[in-house]
From Swiss-Prot:
Region (Disordered): 1-20
Highest taxon of source: Bacteria
Family: Belongs to the bacterial ribosomal protein bL27 family.
Keywords, comma-separated and alphabetical: Ribonucleoprotein, Ribosomal protein
One GO term (biological process): translation
PROSITE patterns attached to this UniProt entry: RIBOSOMAL_L27 (PS00831)
Gene Ontology CC annotation, any one: cytosolic large ribosomal subunit
Ribonucleoprotein as UniProt keyword: yes
One Pfam short name: Ribosomal_L27
Protein name (database record): Large ribosomal subunit protein bL27
GO molecular function: structural constituent of ribosome
């Protein structure tokens, strides 16, 4: 009788789904309250004026306005703030 040996098992073939992190609204863009500005792990970007931070460190707009990115302080922190639209 003809026989075929069992094939070996592979130990590869796994990969995690991408998390789609990064800046979602860029400097100078007009945003509405609630818009997500940055998705991140940890605080690469810190919240400034009119910006909130979620429990997963997501930054979001608290008011309608224009997005501004700045570097502040001796620690050279990247800060995102919203400049409210002139009424």
């Amino acid at each position: 009788m003809a026989h075929k040996k069992a094939g070996g098992s592979s130990r590869n073939g796994r990969d995690s789904e991408s998390k789609r992190l990064g800046v979602k609204r860029f400097g100078g863009q007009v945003v509405l309250a609630g818009n997500i500005l940055v998705r991140q792990r940890g605080t690469q970007f810190h919240p400034g004026d009119n910006v909130g931070i979620g429990k997963d460190h997501t930054l979001f707009a608290k008011t309608d306005g224009t997005v501004k990115f700045e570097i502040k302080g001796a620690a050279r922190r990247k800060v995102v703030r919203i400049e409210p639209l002139a009424a």
